[in-house]
Curated annotation (Swiss-Prot):
Localization: Cell inner membrane
UniProt GO molecular function: aspartic-type endopeptidase activity
Entry's EC annotation: 3.4.23.36
Pfam families in alphabetical order: Peptidase_A8
Entry similarity comment: Belongs to the peptidase A8 family.
NCBIfam families recorded: lspA (TIGR00077)
Associated pathway: Protein modification; lipoprotein biosynthesis (signal peptide cleavage)
Active-site residue numbers: D126, D144
Name under which the protein is recorded: Lipoprotein signal peptidase
Function: This protein specifically catalyzes the removal of signal peptides from prolipoproteins.
Length: 166
């Protein structure tokens, strides 16, 4: 009797979760380094347009809802966990779609990196500060960067898919 190896049609989940784990590790290690090196609000200019600075974000992207009474910590944590469940489902179903899955893996790693901050500290640790003259882009972290790159790749993948079906 011949043995057949069944390969799931959905593709493997492990490689994508591995990418998410790498994002989480780099994100958390960078935040630990900043916490050990900087006092809150301290900044170190690396170039004429880029500083490292330690700030806490109790809200969402760009400080949205950061001045709310505290409920946002749990709301954004729940949102991150919900996004994790949806992304894991999508990765199981579409793991063979490389660009789509890579984008989701980056978003997942970034979302979980920020969820970990909210659970451990009650806020997200941000430290990358780009500026021009007196204008500063809101500080962010590696998790935010992974989410942004993942979102851009997701949009690119969808545009490519739509154009391919015309």
């Amino acid at each position: 009797m011949a043995k057949t190896l069944s390969k799931p049609a959905s593709g493997a989940l492990a490689p994508w979760l591995g990418i998410s784990l790498i994002v989480i590790l780099f994100d958390q290690l960078s935040k630990i380094a900043i916490l050990k090196t900087f006092a809150y609000g301290a900044q170190h200019a690396l170039t004429s347009f880029f500083n490292l600075v330690l700030v806490y974000n109790r809200g969402a992207a760009f400080g949205f809802l950061s001045t709310a009474s505290g409920w946002q910590r749990w709301a954004f944590t729940a949102l991150g966990i919900g996004a994790t469940l949806v992304i894991c489902y999508l990765l199981r179903r579409h793991g063979q779609q490389r660009l789509f899955s890579l984008s989701l893996a980056l978003i997942l790693g970034g979302a979980l990196g920020n969820v970990i901050d909210r659970l451990l500290y009650g806020h997200v640790i941000d430290f990358l500060d780009f500026h021009l003259g007196g204008w500063h882009f809101p500080a962010f972290n590696l998790a935010d960067s992974a989410i942004t790159v993942g979102a851009v790749l997701l949009i690119y993948d969808e545009l490519r898919r739509v154009r391919g079906t015309r």
